[in-house]
Design a protein with these regions (language model features):
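A structural boundary/capping signal
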Residues: 2-265
Length: 265
């Protein structure tokens, strides 16, 4: 063990909370070397050290989740399911990533007998499970959090389309997400489109100048921006910092100093 880390760990037992906070700050600067050491200490019999070790681990987990989401937001065409899980974990930070992924895999398994490899069968399955699109004027964070959407079968138009697109891809059906007059739909290679908002209706494609195509990164950035807006509306400094920080990094902004006070402090 690094001597500096060893000496700092001994100081975690300090009765003075302010001193302990300074020690924690110093330890966090040595993140790459901490994991193994902290695992050994997390069940120590010393309650003060145990509490502070758990605090450090929580901070490290938050940092890593934020870094992972920032990376996904910066990719040219990000992996959509992983990105949505990472975004969910920013808003519901007490949830576990494996639990959210289980909701996704359970959803996939439930579709197997429906053979969702064409628009008709895909639409039938989504109607069967009761998947609906939330009204456009209802801006609720739950509609943009993958785990909640998979539990409630209701979500924002773009997220419902994202879920449908990823499900279809697993069955060999390649769909593109498009926006027509503000509403989202899924476009198939044969020129048909599936419209979740209209009860999973299948329709003919509009002209090329009538729609905008959205890629994975655009969808993830929009969902992150909506959650950031929800955080500002509810004055939630914690989420403003975490989600806002991830978005800022995609614009090469290391901090949120461009925001008005008090969010830039």
């Amino acid at each position: 063990m690094n001597n500096d880390i060893e000496n700092l760990l001994k100081l975690l037992d300090d009765d003075n909370q302010q001193s302990a906070n300074l020690v924690i700050a110093e330890l966090l600067k040595r993140e790459p070397e901490l994991d193994t050491v902290l695992q050994k200490l997390q069940e120590t019999e010393n309650p003060k050290i145990r509490k502070r070790v758990h605090q450090i681990q929580s901070i490290l987990t938050t940092r890593r989740r934020r870094k992972s989401l920032a990376h996904s937001l910066a990719l040219k065409n990000t992996e959509l399911v992983n990105g949505c899980v990472e975004l969910h974990m920013q808003w519901y930070d007490n949830d576990s990533e494996p639990a959210v992924m289980r909701l996704w895999t359970d959803f996939i398994k439930s579709s197997e007998k429906y053979h969702t490899d064409n628009l008709e069968r895909l639409a039938r399955f989504m109607r069967k499970v009761g998947f609906t699109v939330a009204p456009r004027d209802e801006v609720e964070p739950d509609y943009y959090c993958l785990g909640i959407v998979l539990e409630e079968f209701t979500g924002a138009d773009p997220l419902v389309c994202a879920i449908t697109k990823e499900l279809a891809a697993l069955r060999g059906l390649s769909l593109r997400i498009i926006q027509i007059m503000g509403d989202f739909a899924l476009m198939a290679p044969d020129g048909k489109m599936l419209i979740p908002k209209n009860g999973w209706k299948i329709a003919e494609m509009p002209g090329a100048d009538e729609y905008i195509e959205w890629d994975n990164t655009m969808l993830l950035k929009m969902a992150a921006s909506i959650l950031f807006l929800c955080a500002v509306n509810t004055d939630s400094f914690r989420y403003i910092h975490t989600i806002g920080g991830c978005i800022a990094k995609t614009a090469c902004k290391p901090t949120l100093e461009f925001l008005p006070y008090p969010y830039n402090s």
